[in-house]
Amino acid sequence: MKLWGGRFTHQVDDLVNTFNSSISFDSRMYKEDIIGSIAHVTMLGEEKIIPKEDSKKIASGLYEILDKLNQGVLKIDNSSEDIHSFIESTLTDYIGEEGKKLHTGRSRNDQVTLDTKLYLKGYIKILICEILNLEKTLLNLSSENKETIMPGYTHMQKAQPITFAHHILAYSEMFKRDISRLLDCYKRLDEMPLGSGALATTTYPINREKVSELLGFSKVTLNSLDSVSDRDYAIETLSCLSLLMMHLSRFSEEIIIWSTDEFKFIELDDSYSTGSSIMPQKKNPDVAELVRGKTGRVYGDLMTLLTVMKGLPLAYNKDMQEDKEALFDGLDTTLLSIKTFNGMIKTMKINKSLMKTSASSGFTNATDVADYLVKKGVAFRDAHEIVGNLILYCIDEGKSIDNLSLSEFKTFSNKFENDIYKAINLLTCIEERKVIGGPSISSINIQIEHLNNFIQESNEKLNFLK
């Protein structure tokens, strides 16, 4: 059944029907469409816009359809134009003429916006739950690796010694921001659009606040033109997902590097690796590589929506039907990526000894030698020059800083004493960095405590979301 057609004298071409149809992708919103319709028809009955007995009969029919769809007894007809027309035509088949009163006082324009917002509200909560599961994994990893020394890098060159916990907690901060962004996005999503009609509301005395209350929205939208032409909520969601995927991609890149034979910092579990069809020895980090690749896919979904919306006049235009495939793909891709990535890092093995050995080379304690001289009264710029010359000497002689004798140290400055050896010990280098945000154990403990509190607080916020 089509929801329109009275003014047409010819049947629409089959090719146009196929081109126009959205049932193949908007059918996933059948629950939201039915729940929204139940709230709408309940209001119609309470406001005496339709007889109350008709309202109850329609609601009962909608509940029956929902139950049968959930059980798989009723199958969605893919020849329908969209999920809205399928639900309404099925309702009329079930209960008769009263079903035709369901659409009183609304348009598909405000209906589809409502469905999408309801769907997104539920999906965002699922996404946040999965990010929190990932954060719990990072919390455990960092708690177990407070003293696991590794090299920190800038420009992919060894820079200063840090701990694996410090490195892992850097990503936890990124994911904390992702959760905060999604929660913030949820606030703007939480505005009920139904009642906006096609663009100019309706002449029926509907009660939008009642529908909003029934559906668990915090408020109603204030301008009907904006309500039906707005897709900011979808674009903002995809923006949040793009940033989240970027963080997963950066982490994945490091997982890939760390798992190479050249690094061997970690070993991925067999259950999260794949092999080669020709090279028997291969163990490939496909999960990390796919996360990295799928990030571009989510970026593409965002660009699709931005491009669709960039030149549209008010109010609704059919171009906006193109929002759902991109939105749903971005949601599904991100959710699967988070869950799979979490399993990968939860099961990977950490090679602590190789991390420490790597941190011991590459002059990662050079900055600490300069800081040592500063504490002895040497200006930092002079200390920097002295240590630069010392490093050049080490390179020429094939030595590390730790292997220099005191007399060799004194060749570069008479400020060097026996306590230099304690100052350049890697653990000392780390423990001296007690500043908030640093890699020392005391600082890491604070970061871990903050992460633990954040996880608990975020779970509490989730419980309060309608």
Curated annotation (Swiss-Prot):
Keywords: Amino-acid biosynthesis, Arginine biosynthesis, Cytoplasm, Lyase. Its EC number is 4.3.2.1. It catalyses: 2-(N(omega)-L-arginino)succinate = fumarate + L-arginine. Pfam families: ASL_C2 (PF14698), Lyase_1 (PF00206). GO terms for biological process: arginine biosynthetic process via ornithine; L-arginine biosynthetic process. It is found in: Cytoplasm. GO terms for cellular component: cytosol. Pathway: Amino-acid biosynthesis; L-arginine biosynthesis; L-arginine from L-ornithine and carbamoyl phosphate: step 3/3. It is an enzyme of class 4 (lyase). SUPFAM superfamilies: L-aspartase-like. GO terms for molecular function: argininosuccinate lyase activity. Belongs to the lyase 1 family. Argininosuccinate lyase subfamily. NCBIfam families: argH. This is Argininosuccinate lyase. It comes from Clostridium perfringens (strain 13 / Type A). The lineage of its organism: Bacteria, Bacillati, Bacillota, Clostridia, Eubacteriales.
